[in-house]
């Protein structure tokens, strides 16, 4: 539950995030194939990334609301970012940093069609191919749809973190 607290006459929403872990060795098979990130897709990726996180960042007053605006913000991370394409258009993306899944996004026009789950499973398989360590991810309490997906797939809360 989010709680509003008055700080210096400004209302600030408390931000709670869950660290979640998947400890099973077996991962359900994904029906998709992702490709490594390529710079030619940056503009589309940036648009989708910002669209996906805008509502949450605004609701939680995390500024800037449109965080991603330059390639150099992700240049060190692109080797771990994977894209799902549909006829050359980005359907979604998932980042796999070691044993952590991050920045799982689905193009708004493809949402609610199962791509989020498929990207999650693909990322989990990608990690499992290299390691049997627990797979981790973080999700804001605000993002209940993502939280419920992660629980349904088998992730469990390992830690509750108060961000602000």
Region roles according to the model:
Residues 83, 88-105:
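Conserved beta-strand in the GNAT
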Residues 104-112, 140:
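A short, internal acetyl-CoA/4′-phosphopantetheine-binding micro-motif in the GNAT/acyltransferase core
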Residues 110, 114-123:
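Conserved acetyl-CoA pyrophosphate-binding loop and the N-cap/start of the following alpha-helix
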Residues 1-3, 137-147, 163-164:
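Conserved beta-strand-loop-alpha-helix junction that forms the acyl-donor binding cleft
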Residues 47-60:
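Helix-loop element at the rim of GNAT/NAT acetyltransferase active sites that forms part
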Residues 57-90:
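Active-site rim helix/loop that mediates acceptor-substrate recognition in acyltransferases
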Residues 1-31, 164:
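Acyl-donor-binding surface of acyltransferase catalytic domains
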Residues 33-47:
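A short beta-loop-alpha structural element at the N-terminal edge
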């Amino acid at each position: 539950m989010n709680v509003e607290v008055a700080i210096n006459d400004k209302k600030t929403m408390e931000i709670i995030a869950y660290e979640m872990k998947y400890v099973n060795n077996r991962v359900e098979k994904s029906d998709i194939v992702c490709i490594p990130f390529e710079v030619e897709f940056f503009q589309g990726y940036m648009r989708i990334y910002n669209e996906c996180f805008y509502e949450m960042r605004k609701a939680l007053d995390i500024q800037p609301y449109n965080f991603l605006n330059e390639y150099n913000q992700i240049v060190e991370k692109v080797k771990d970012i994977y894209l799902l394409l549909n006829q050359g258009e980005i359907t979604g993306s998932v980042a796999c940093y070691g044993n952590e899944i991050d920045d799982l996004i689905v193009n708004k026009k493809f949402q609610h069609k199962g791509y989020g789950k498929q990207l999650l499973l693909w990322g989990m398989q990608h990690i499992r191919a290299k390691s049997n360590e627990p797979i981790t991810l973080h999700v804001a309490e605000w993002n209940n749809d993502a939280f419920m997906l992660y629980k349904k797939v088998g992730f469990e809360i390992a830690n509750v973190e108060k961000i602000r």
